[in-house]
Swiss-Prot record:
SUPFAM superfamilies: P-loop containing nucleoside triphosphate hydrolases (SSF52540). Keywords: ATP-binding, Cell inner membrane, Cell membrane, Membrane, Nucleotide-binding, Phosphate transport, Translocase, Transport. Part of the ABC transporter complex PstSACB involved in phosphate import. Responsible for energy coupling to the transport system. It catalyses: phosphate(out) + ATP + H2O = ADP + 2 phosphate(in) + H(+). This is Phosphate import ATP-binding protein PstB. It comes from the Bacteria. Belongs to the ABC transporter superfamily. Phosphate importer (TC 3.A.1.7) family. Its EC number is 7.3.2.1. One of its GO terms (molecular function) is ATPase-coupled phosphate ion transmembrane transporter activity. ATP binds at residues 44-51. GO terms for cellular component: plasma membrane. The gene is pstB. The complex is composed of two ATP-binding proteins (PstB), two transmembrane proteins (PstC and PstA) and a solute-binding protein (PstS). Residues 12-253 form the ABC transporter domain.
């Protein structure tokens, strides 16, 4: 295992992270650096800890009981695991998109405006501009500009997922976490999301969990392979997929297990 990125180029630094579901030790001594304005992918078999690791970056685990993290996660040099961390501000700065599209039960416009209203006081014109900006960034504006006040549920599955991405970036986070964002989508919608991910890294640090190794190879700059709660190998994506250093990594990417 190698850390890949030096501190100067890192947005997130993870040091000796351990995570527990009750007494179950789910993440074991994880250390890695997530590069700024790059796409980092976490791969590995089901139950390896990749989604758990992702959710430590905005402390989503605090929504549930009997879960705790130990170690350090530095976001721009500040440890987010301390009790002093404002969780609401953290989640505004570290947005998240889940496996299944989760539009709010409201209009397309209000799906985007909802989070913005929690953190900013904008005029109607400013909010209109922000909604258009977010939908444009998510490659959805041309498809929704004439039906902004229709329900978010009226969109197709792929459009709903892009709406969730637009909602996530509308509050202008610096990091975007994607937890298997294409697993419920058809190949065409998946292709559009992958194109979007590649475009977003110019402005955001993106971390994606995926079961699809081809997707990781297409979309990411760096890839981490995890197994049974441990970080087995972390490298630039081309190197990990073509010349992995660890036999476990090679076995997984060649289909011998997982």
């Amino acid at each position: 295992m190698n850390i890949v990125n030096d501190i100067a180029s890192s947005k997130i630094q993870v040091h000796n992270l351990n995570f527990y579901y009750g007494k179950f030790h789910a993440l074991k001594n994880i250390t890695l650096n997530i590069a700024k304005n790059k796409v980092t992918a976490f791969i590995g078999p089901s139950g390896c800890g990749k989604s758990t690791l992702l959710r430590t970056f905005n402390k989503m685990y605090e929504l549930y009981g009997e879960q705790r993290a130990e170690g350090k996660i530095l976001l721009d040099g500040k440890n987010i695991l301390t009790d002093k961390q404002d969780v609401a501000l953290l989640r505004a700065n570290v947005g998240m998109v889940f496996q299944k599209p989760t539009p709010f039960p409201m209009s397309i416009y209000d799906n985007i405006a909802f989070g913005v209203r929690l953190f900013e006081k904008l005029s109607r014109a400013e909010m209109d501009e922000r909604v258009q900006w977010a939908l444009t960034k998510a490659a959805l504006w041309s498809e929704t500009r004439d039906k902004l006040y229709q329900s978010g549920y009226s969109l197709s599955g792929g459009q709903q997922q892009r709406l969730c991405i637009a909602r996530g970036i509308a509050i202008r986070p610096e990091v975007l976490l994607l937890d298997e964002p294409c697993s419920a989508l058809d190949p065409i919608s998946t292709g559009r999301i992958e194109e979007l991910i590649s475009e977003l890294k110019s402005e955001y640090t993106v971390v994606i969990v995926t079961h699809n190794m081809q997707q990781a190879a297409r979309c990411s700059d760096h890839t981490a392979f995890m197994y049974l709660g441990e970080l087995i190998e972390f490298s630039d994506t081309d190197t990990l997929f073509t010349t992995p250093k660890m036999k476990q990594t090679e076995d997984y990417i060649t289909g011998r297990y997982g």
